[in-house]
């Protein structure tokens, strides 16, 4: 609603309260008579609403115009300098001008929201981040800061997610918690680009196929002790720069270790330069030698503590810095295999470090540093004192606590997928919890890049990685698969483990009885037998059969002679309902879609967050650098020593 102040007549001298009796000049008298200037009063009323000038832009009535206007001096008979008139007009108008500035963080009223929602504006507002959503919207009593919507594939601007009360509803319109992060699917690129990854020629690995201009030799590789006489046609940096201290002695041999192809230059090497020290023969000095080998690592991060865990990729131990008492988790990578070259080993280590150091999210472990000492690599990470497996097996988790941890896991997966990365080895052992009750994903040794920036194609992964109970079935039957669908499947298995405290099956093969019954559908008619259903699953090539024949497995679960056939038929259930009936009712729909056998039909992370139950989960999170705990539950943090042994399988 626009407010137009009343207009008054005033002269060019700016005295609106009284007029001078004596005119200063005839020129000013003509301006007073010929020019009609209107202006708001000296003390105009305070404007409560922004003024819309578009309604009066084309009107000819000067009295209705909110700003002073001047008529064109073309019709004045006597000559008047138009520049003088314009300058005096502007100085007079500026005297009564009061600028209105609205801070960008101000919250408009309901009427202004309705008005601005219908008006066309050319101003492009920045996208709403999660912190901005929490700061601008009131929170209901039973919800946390993550009331932002679930992301759908065609999610648009945030206008339709707001209700009349100014708060965000809890339906599918709400933007997800990971919408603030750049999605790899937004950087599509040109599908007709001739330099796309799928259109490139395969890399030539044979050295004889490489053009000569791309073949480089290390400095000093073929040099004798008499200098560069063997290759007179080749240029080197030493031949271009005069060196007055060039002596053909031991320094020439030392230059071989500083080639541009040496990958160890990327690491912070703390090796001792004193080569005259010989290893001690006495066994009593072995501990001292160990500390000497890790002198640089100890000096920077303290001394090694207890072992946290070990796996195929290496072992993780605690290091406590003596200067400030800060605790780190240091992963010692596995030793180089005999079949691996030093270059291949360094490339695998750097790949895991580069992926981990590029990720910064509340639900992702923070990778801090990597150190090389004595041809061993150590990755320094933040320390989280609790592991998810011990917390789950303690039996102290409530269902709201399970929901919170599951949504935190999905938030970390959503961030990974938005960066074009897939973990491929999600399991309870790769989830840790810090002192703020934040679930963090660790171990990116199996992570792959499925989408590169400005590339339109999805790079499929290959190879079977991960633990058997968490494996997606397509990894066993397909050479190439979408790694995003693998993360979704593993996340659903993790939820089943947290809710049921047991695995749904040992491995996703038809030879496993639990998984085979999960894959089977209820017979549509009496003529359709379970063998026919399994034969149909075999044709679809969605799961691996295993080593045991189908009939043998069916006979092992045939009703006993002492058991009633009708009671056995009632107990035997087929299909996903066999597992879903054990889960809470509100979780069954999304878990069923996450455990879809066909990876093409399986939910992606966007559709998972579009579920109403996922949106309504009250989750602990970080907001503006502050830890926000959910009021619906309290996390029971259990250390690994307090966790009981896993229950025996029935």
UniProtKB/Swiss-Prot annotation:
Keywords of this entry: ATP-binding, Cell cycle, Cytoplasm, Kinase, Nucleotide-binding, Phosphoprotein, Serine/threonine-protein kinase, Transferase
GO cellular component: cell division site; cell tip; cytosol
Domain Protein kinase stretches: 302-614
Active site per database record: 425 (proton acceptor)
Entry's Gene Ontology molecular function annotations: ATP binding; protein serine kinase activity; protein serine/threonine kinase activity
Catalytic activity annotation: L-seryl-[protein] + ATP = O-phospho-L-seryl-[protein] + ADP + H(+); L-threonyl-[protein] + ATP = O-phospho-L-threonyl-[protein] + ADP + H(+)
UniProt EC number: 2.7.11.1
Renumbered residue ranges of the record's region Disordered: 1-210, 222-288, 549-570
Ranges in coiled-coil conformation: none
Phosphoserine PTM sites in chain numbering: 72, 286
Biased composition (Basic residues): 222-231, 245-257
Residues that hold ATP according to the record: 308-316, 331
Main location: cytoplasm
Record bears the keyword Kinase: yes
Gene Ontology annotations of biological process type: negative regulation of transcription by RNA polymerase II; regulation of nitrogen utilization; signaling
Cell compartment(s), UniProt: Cytoplasm
UniProt KW Ion transport keyword: no
Residue stretches of biased makeup (Polar residues): 1-14, 140-154
Protein family membership: Belongs to the protein kinase superfamily. Ser/Thr protein kinase family.
Function: Overexpression causes cell cycle arrest.
Protein name per its UniProtKB record: Serine/threonine-protein kinase oca2
Lineage: Eukaryota, Fungi, Dikarya, Ascomycota, Taphrinomycotina
């Amino acid at each position: 609603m626009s407010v137009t102040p009343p207009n008054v007549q005033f002269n060019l001298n700016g005295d609106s309260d009284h007029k001078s009796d004596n005119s200063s000049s005839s020129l000013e008298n003509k301006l007073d008579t010929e020019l009609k200037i209107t202006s708001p009063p000296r003390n105009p009323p305070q404007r409560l609403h922004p003024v819309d000038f578009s309604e009066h832009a084309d009107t000819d009535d000067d009295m209705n115009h909110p700003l002073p206007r001047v008529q064109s001096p073309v019709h004045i008979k006597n000559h008047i300098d138009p520049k003088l008139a314009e300058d005096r007009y502007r100085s007079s108008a500026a005297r009564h001008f009061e600028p209105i500035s609205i801070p960008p963080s101000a919250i408009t009223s309901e009427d202004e929201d309705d008005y601005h929602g219908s008006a066309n504006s050319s101003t492009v507002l920045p996208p709403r981040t999660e912190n901005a959503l929490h700061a601008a919207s009131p929170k209901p009593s039973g919800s946390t800061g993550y009331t932002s919507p679930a992301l759908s594939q065609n999610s648009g601007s945030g206008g339709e997610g707001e209700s009349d009360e100014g708060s965000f509803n809890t339906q599918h319109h709400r933007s997800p918690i990971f919408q603030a992060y750049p999605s790899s699917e937004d950087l599509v690129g040109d599908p007709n680009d001739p330099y796309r990854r799928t259109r490139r020629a395969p890399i030539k690995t044979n050295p004889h196929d490489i053009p000569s201009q791309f073949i480089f030799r290390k400095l000093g590789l073929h040099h004798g002790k008499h200098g560069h006489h063997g290759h007179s046609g080749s240029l080197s940096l030493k031949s271009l720069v005069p060196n007055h201290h060039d002596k053909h002695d031991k320094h020439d041999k030392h230059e071989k270790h500083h080639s541009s192809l040496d990958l160890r230059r990327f690491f912070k090497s703390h090796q001792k330069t004193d080569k005259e020290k010989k290893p001690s023969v006495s066994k009593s000095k072995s501990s001292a030698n160990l500390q000497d080998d890790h002198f640089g690592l100890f000096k920077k991060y303290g001394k090694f503590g207890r072992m946290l865990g070990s796996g195929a990729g290496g072992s993780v131990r605690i290091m406590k810095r003596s200067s400030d008492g800060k605790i780190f988790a240091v992963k010692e990578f596995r030793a180089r295999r005999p079949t691996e070259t030093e270059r291949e080993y360094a490339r695998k280590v750097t790949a895991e470090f580069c992926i981990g150091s590029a990720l910064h999210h509340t639900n992702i472990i923070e990778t801090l540093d990597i150190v090389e000492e004595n041809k061993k690599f150590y990755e320094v990470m933040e320390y989280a004192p609790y592991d998810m497996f011990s917390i789950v097996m303690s039996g102290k988790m409530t269902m709201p606590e399970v929901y919170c941890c599951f949504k935190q896991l999905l938030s970390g997966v959503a961030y990974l997928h938005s960066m074009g990365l897939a973990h491929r080895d999600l399991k309870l052992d790769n989830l840790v919890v810090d002192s703020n009750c934040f679930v963090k994903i660790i171990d990116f040794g199996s992570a792959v890049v499925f989408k590169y920036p400005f590339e339109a194609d999805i790079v499929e992964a290959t190879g079977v990685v991960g633990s058997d109970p968490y494996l997606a079935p397509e990894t066993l039957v397909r050479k190439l698969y979408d790694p995003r669908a693998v993360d979704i499947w593993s996340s659903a298995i993790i939820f089943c483990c947290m809710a049921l405290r047991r695995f749904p099956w040992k491995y996703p093969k038809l030879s496993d009885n639990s998984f085979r019954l999960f894959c089977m559908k209820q017979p549509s008619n009496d003529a359709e037998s379970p063998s026919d259903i399994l034969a149909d699953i075999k044709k679809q090539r969605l799961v691996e059969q295993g080593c045991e024949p189908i009939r043998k497995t069916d006979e092992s679960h045939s009703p006993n002679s002492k058991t009633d056939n009708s009671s056995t038929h009632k107990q035997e259930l087929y299909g996903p309902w066999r597992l879903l009936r054990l889960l809470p009712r509100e979780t069954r729909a999304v878990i069923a879609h996450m455990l879809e056998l066909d990876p093409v039909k399986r939910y992606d992370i966007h559709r998972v967050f579009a579920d109403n139950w996922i949106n309504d989960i009250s989750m602990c999170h970080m907001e503006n650098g502050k830890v926000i705990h959910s009021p619906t539950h309290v996390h029971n943090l259990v250390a690994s020593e307090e966790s009981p042994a896993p229950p025996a399988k029935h």
